[in-house]
Amino acid sequence: MNLIAAVDKNWAIGCKNKLLVSIPADMKFFRETTTGKVVVMGRKTLESFPNGQPLKKRVNIVLTHDKNFKAGDAIIVHSIEELREELKKYPSEDIYVIGGETIYKQLLDDCDVAHITKIDYAFEADAYFPNLDEMPEWKITQDSEEQTYFDLEYYFVKYEKQVQ
């Protein structure tokens, strides 16, 4: 399974249920990487999308404790166990965990690849991604050249979990 996220220099991912910054090249990378695949998210992540609707051209799976929650054609699950059962229907390499903070932490151990856009700036934030640089089992296997968006510098980095 894969994780995909944009993080700042403190591994922050959001503030007040919004992304820290919207970088067009990062959004394009996200679209190209996840289109036609399975995306897994929490309810608050889904609600942060335009009109709170599932992403087009993807299988959307939403984890929520709210038994009455519905969202378009999204598949709704209510526990990690139910989510893991649902995910067995899909090839692991086609599954992308897209947030937010709680879902990333809950599914980190199930994943073996992380596509991280690292932004060289510290934003005000209240949601964080686990710091993969502090986890010896996660190694950088690809690192892009420095990219810029106005005065922000960022990199596309691929981490892979090493089998211990």
Question: Where are the regions that the model predicts?
Answer:
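Enzymes that bind and transform nitrogen-containing heteroaromatic metabolites
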Residues: M1-Q164
